[in-house]
Amino acid sequence: SKTCIIHNDWRFDNVILDPKNPTQVIGVLDWEMATLGDPLMDLGSALAYWVEDTDNQIFKATRRQPTHLKGMFTRQQVVDYYLQKTGLSTDNWTFYEVFGIFRLAVIAQQIYYRYYHKQTNNPAFKDFWIVIHALHIRALKLIGLQKIEANELAQKYIAKFKELMPK
C-alpha cells in the first residue's frame, strides 16, 4: 500500500458529525497518535472496534460504538467501500484485520493492567481481561481461516502443476 498520514485512532467518538447532516464528518478529534503509515493499517485498527450483530456475546457486551445497528455496514462492507473509494487494493486483508485486533488487545491489556494495579478505579475495566482473550481468539480464527484458504489455493496450484508435468 502507499504511505500517508494515518490517524491511528478512528472511532465514532473521535469524529464530529454535522447536526444537520449526520452522515457528514465536520471534524476529527484525538490526533496525538497520528503518524505516517499504511492507510490500510488505519482501517484495520478502526474495524477492530467494529462490533456486528453476528459477533460473539463478549464483543456485544463490551461494544462502545453503534456499529451493530440496522443500516450499519458490516466490516466487510466497510473494507469494500473503502477500497473502492480510495482505489487501494490488498491481496491480504486478513493481515490488516489481525493487526487491528492485536493493537486493540494491547490497548485493552494496558487499560486492564492499570485497573488491576489500582491506577484507575473505573469498574468498566474490571472484565477487560476477558476481552483480551476474546480478541486473541478472534485473531487466531482469522489466521486459521487464512491458512485454510492458502492451503486450498496451494492444492489447486499443485494439481494444475501436476497436469502440466510430462508423464
Features from the language model and the residues they span:
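Regulatory N- and C-terminal appendages and interdomain linkers associated
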Residues: 106, 110, 114-167
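Conserved NTP-binding catalytic cores of kinases and kinase-like/nucleotidyltransferase enzymes
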Residues: 4, 16-26, 87-90, 147-167
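Conserved acidic
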Residues: 2, 74, 92
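Active-site activation/catalytic loop segments of kinase-like enzymes and analogous catalytic loops
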Residues: 41-86, 100-118
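All-alpha amphipathic helical-bundle segments outside canonical DNA-binding/catalytic cores
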Residues: 89-100
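Active-site acidic catalytic loop and adjacent metal/ATP-binding pocket
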Residues: 1-41, 45-47
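Pocket-edge positions in alpha/beta enzyme catalytic cores
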Residues: 35, 67-70, 124-127
